[in-house]
């Protein structure tokens, strides 16, 4: 059964008015909120009532969702176009039950690889790993892009209060040399360890940055042997790693059943462990595992990722929402939106179903946002008075790591005020009367009132964490991961491939050849616009 069928459109005819719904039901918050350990999920400010929620849940029950959940956790190859299992959950699974993929118990492999990463981290942190000149490592530079960068960078920043080593961790991703130079300007070649994170060891941006970092190192040492002391790799291409000069003992695994955007739980999370220590990294995994169990074992009506996905899919199918705002009210989560943009949009930005047929309904949306209260002085105007339908997720942390309680109270007050303003708004009469009370005459009040009306009745969800710890952050990330999965099932699309990014890579290589040789076939096959752009660049 398709989730986006005509029946969903009729639900809109319920004409939900949030103010009225709250006025007539003093148990609305109790009914439309859930709790998982230290995470409180309030979805009462959404455009639903008992009937709508019941209808959405019935659709989920009639779908293949239950079977798909079992298939994913059991290692079925649900990534059908690449014939791969989807098992990032296995990386944080604390059980000992065997899980066989292609004839191998991957639990044993995962345990072995975790131990290798732990030993490396402890060796570097303790000072037993030394640079080529014998000095202790002080800086880690992670070179990767996409999932090899966004997830670890987000977590390292979010958990800054938990940094417990003397290591400074830097991230390099963009092929623009400025990205690399920002890191190289603040590190010492004698005390820096580079992590090259690339499954194929051929990702253009990562490889180019790695080669330049290697040249920088050798400009200092003038000895190829130094590479082994200052580089480790996370890759499945051992021959390329060895050719680069990295000791294969320090090449860490990436499995085909872990997608890049879900890989921070794997060896890709090494940079996280260097910052917060391996014990805290394990707590991050444990938090995610707690949500995995919640997702697997909880009935849909009390299942947070399922409710998240049902609401988002409902708005997409029924209200034609093309955008989702994500507003974390905590500066530590400043990279959370960037991280989820990739996780969500690369997963569900599809236009054909599992069978390869073009779908006639909307799937993925544009996920965007920023940290509060910055957004209030930037784009919240559009949320409150624009005429685009944009559901909002607020993320708030009840307690902070610092002692500036007045700052924390102001931050939370602003967060809750924004969700309340989206819900209630302010009517023309309210504004008009306030303007009269402020001293304006009737003519002036009438002229200004229409400009100050805020329609309200705009849906939002608030996710409140007790604290932002490794455990709770792991849980938060897993909630969104499973939401993405559920939406893919409801829309009957493959959330785990990303063929849309391949064409640009291919054309980029062709254009690079064309830029270097205007007699090449690649140049001759260019369109006039691209040829003219190249000419403009060459003329400078």
UniProtKB/Swiss-Prot annotation:
| Family matches, as InterPro entries | G6P_Isomerase (IPR001672), G6P_Isomerase_C (IPR023096), Phosphoglucose_isomerase_CS (IPR018189), SIS_dom_sf (IPR046348), SIS_PGI_1 (IPR035476), SIS_PGI_2 (IPR035482)
Name under which the protein is recorded? Glucose-6-phosphate isomerase
A Gene Ontology biological process noted in the UniProt record is:
glucose 6-phosphate metabolic process
What does the protein in this record do? Catalyzes the reversible isomerization of glucose-6-phosphate to fructose-6-phosphate.
For this protein, the record's PANTHER family field holds: GLUCOSE-6-PHOSPHATE ISOMERASE
Which HAMAP family does the record match to this protein? G6P_isomerase
Q: What's one Pfam family here?
A: PGI
Task: List, alphabetically, the GO terms of the cellular component aspect.
Answer: cytosol
The alphabetized UniProt keywords are: Cytoplasm, Gluconeogenesis, Glycolysis, Isomerase
Q: Which domain of life is it from?
A: Bacteria
Q: Which residues form the active site?
A: 346, 377, 505
Family of this protein: Belongs to the GPI family.
Give each disulfide bond as a residue pair: none
Give the EC class as a word. isomerase
Q: Which reaction does it catalyse?
A: alpha-D-glucose 6-phosphate = beta-D-fructose 6-phosphate
Q: Where in the cell is it found?
A: Cytoplasm
Q: Which GO terms describe its molecular function?
A: carbohydrate derivative binding; glucose-6-phosphate isomerase activity; monosaccharide binding
Q: Which taxonomic lineage is given here?
A: Bacteria, Pseudomonadati, Pseudomonadota, Gammaproteobacteria, Thiotrichales
Which pathway is recorded for this entry? Carbohydrate biosynthesis; gluconeogenesis; Carbohydrate degradation; glycolysis; D-glyceraldehyde 3-phosphate and glycerone phosphate from D-glucose: step 2/4
Q: Which SUPFAM superfamilies match?
A: SIS domain
EC number(s) per entry: 5.3.1.9
């Amino acid at each position: 059964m398709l989730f986006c069928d005509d029946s969903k459109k009729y639900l809109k005819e319920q004409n939900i008015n949030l103010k009225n719904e709250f006025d007539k039901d003093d148990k609305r918050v109790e009914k439309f909120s859930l709790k998982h350990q230290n995470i409180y999920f309030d979805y009462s400010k959404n455009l639903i009532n008992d009937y709508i929620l019941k209808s959405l849940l019935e659709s989920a029950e009639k779908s293949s969702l239950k079977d798909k959940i079992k298939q994913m956790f059991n290692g079925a190859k649900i990534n059908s176009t690449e014939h791969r299992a989807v098992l990032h959950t296995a990386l944080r699974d604390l059980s000992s039950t065997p899980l066989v993929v292609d004839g191998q118990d991957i639990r044993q492999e995962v345990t072995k690889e975790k131990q290798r990463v732990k030993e490396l981290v402890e060796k570097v942190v303790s000072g037993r790993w030394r640079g080529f000149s014998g000095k202790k490592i002080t800086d880690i530079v992670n070179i990767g892009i996409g999932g090899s960068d966004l997830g670890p960078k987000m977590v390292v920043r979010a958990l800054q209060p938990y940094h417990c080593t003397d290591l400074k961790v830097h991230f390099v991703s963009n092929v623009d040399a400025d990205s690399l130079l920002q890191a190289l300007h603040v590190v010492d070649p004698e005390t820096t360890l580079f992590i090259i994170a690339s499954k194929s060891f051929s990702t253009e941006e990562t490889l180019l940055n790695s080669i330049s970092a290697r040249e920088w190192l050798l400009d200092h040492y003038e000895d190829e042997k130094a590479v082994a002391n200052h580089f480790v790799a996370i890759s499945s291409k051992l021959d390329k790693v060895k050719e680069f000069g990295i000791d294969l003992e320090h090449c860490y695994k990436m499995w085909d059943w872990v997608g890049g955007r879900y890989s921070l739980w794997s060896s890709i999370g090494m940079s996280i462990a260097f910052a917060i220590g391996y014990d805290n990294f394990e707590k991050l995994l444990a938090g995610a595992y707690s949500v995995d169990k919640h997702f697997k074992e909880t009935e849909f009506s009390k299942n947070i990722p399922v409710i998240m996905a049902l609401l988002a899919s409902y708005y997409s199918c029924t209200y034609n929402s093309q955008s989702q705002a994500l507003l974390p009210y905590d500066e530590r989560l400043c990279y959370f939106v960037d991280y989820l943009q990739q996780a969500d949009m690369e997963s569900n930005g599809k236009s054909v179903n599992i069978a390869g047929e073009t779908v006639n309904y909307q799937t993925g949306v544009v996920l965007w946002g920023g940290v509060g209260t910055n957004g209030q002085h930037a784009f919240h105007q559009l949320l409150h008075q624009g005429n685009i339908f944009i559901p909002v997720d607020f993320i708030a942390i009840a307690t902070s790591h610092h002692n500036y309680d007045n700052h924390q109270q102001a931050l939370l007050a602003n967060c809750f005020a924004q969700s309340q303003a989206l819900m209630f708004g302010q009517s023309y009469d309210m504004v008009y009367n306030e303007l009269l009370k402020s001293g304006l005459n009737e003519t002036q009040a009438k002229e200004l009132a229409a400009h100050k009306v805020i329609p309200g009745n705009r849906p939002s969800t608030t996710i409140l964490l007790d604290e932002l710890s490794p455990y709770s952050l792991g849980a938060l990330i897993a909630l969104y991961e499973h939401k993405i999965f559920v939406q893919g099932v409801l829309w009957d699309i493959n959330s785990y491939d990303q063929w849309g990014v391949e064409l640009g890579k291919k054309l980029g290589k062709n254009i690079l050849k064309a830029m270097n040789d205007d007699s090449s076939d690649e140049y001759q096959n260019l369109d006039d616009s691209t040829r003219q752009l190249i000419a403009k660049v060459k003329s400078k």
